[in-house]
């Protein structure tokens, strides 16, 4: 039995969240009555209201009146008044991943998982399937610049979704094609151990049906090891590794982007097929690898090389993924969501390759627990930044941890050999700090999953106001 059409109002608690808003938008476009609430106003709330979805600011018991279904994410606490009211009224409560799974049952699906690169890779797969006239439905974890939203309803039989592993619920998603970009120690607050993280990703791949396939990056040692332990499923490997089925070769910087080839080698016949002259308008090896994963899916689904080449060249990117927010006196300001050491290192390497000037990193650490558990990694991931400006930790609802703060992080970076580390006393001081550091040709890269994105967009104007 599939999701029936006659379901009444579907109420989303926390509808403004990036994952929840995408599901709500697709359900609305399918013709379901959708409503919801969020703790605050925001761009996603405004967008959903513009589509005719009723959104209330604040969580109150009366908000669920008339709802037939309540959708919650794992971020919603058990004492949330709307959740309590729904349970008191015997209204069915559905987890976000379960509702996404119901939508996925209506289509053939590509699900993209991995500690890093999910959102960009999801957007690339969507762009390639779009170009191949698949007209896919898409639910992403970030705003796709080409759509101006993180979700769209397509008329085709395929669906492309970002599979969020943070709470383990990605194992509920029924997918025909699974991509695994990488697996690093992350979300240990949920999984407790890295072994448990790896087990979850292995199960994600093993859940693929016999007629589907997985696309896995064997440049990553953990993923390569996982490939060797997975039996009875078809796996297409990718990476710069010479053993990859889809091999990224001849990668070279190309202005603000990359130029490369992807060579496919058939394991049965050893025949090679080359997709050459690929130009991606995004810098960095990590983005070229993300593109290789998407190209591998497109190739398997029969999309012609010329279509792949054209779609990659036209890829418009994702909001908060190496997004240029403006310039000042020849200085380029970049906003990026990177908040894990692996992501930060990749972004700064891309910045280094994109400019002959200096790279100034402005980092707002995200969560005390993440900074604590990965402190050594954070202290060694800024090597491609000439200067690191460190803001206070963005708590994301967490209580402070003694010895885990901006000043200790500054000391840690210096102790690990970084030559220039500057503590940011307050956000209002950022423009003055950058004005004293940056010269024409330099890149200023704002990094973090908190409200640093607002600083990045305000910074060009604030710098101009200084003269």
Swiss-Prot record:
Positions annotated to bind ATP: 114-120
InterPro entries reported for this sequence: Mur-like_cat_sf, Mur_ligase_C, Mur_ligase_C_dom_sf, Mur_ligase_cen, Mur_ligase_N, MurCDEF_pg_biosynth, UDP-N-AcMur_Ala_ligase_MurC
Catalytic activity entry: UDP-N-acetyl-alpha-D-muramate + L-alanine + ATP = UDP-N-acetyl-alpha-D-muramoyl-L-alanine + ADP + phosphate + H(+)
One GO CC term, this protein: cytoplasm
EC number: 6.3.2.8
Alphabetic keyword roster: ATP-binding, Cell cycle, Cell division, Cell shape, Cell wall biogenesis/degradation, Cytoplasm, Ligase, Nucleotide-binding, Peptidoglycan synthesis
UniProt pathway: Cell wall biogenesis; peptidoglycan biosynthesis
Enzymatic class: ligase
Localization (cell): Cytoplasm
Parts forming coiled coils: none
Gene Ontology molecular functions: ATP binding; UDP-N-acetylmuramate-L-alanine ligase activity
GO biological process per UniProt: cell division; cell wall organization; peptidoglycan biosynthetic process; regulation of cell shape
Pfam families the record matches: Mur_ligase, Mur_ligase_C, Mur_ligase_M
Gene3D superfamilies in alphabetical order: Mur ligase, C-terminal domain, Mur-like, catalytic domain, NAD(P)-binding Rossmann-like Domain
Similarity field: Belongs to the MurCDEF family.
Function: Cell wall formation.
Name used for this protein in its record: UDP-N-acetylmuramate--L-alanine ligase
Species this protein is from: Nitrobacter hamburgensis (strain DSM 10229 / NCIMB 13809 / X14)
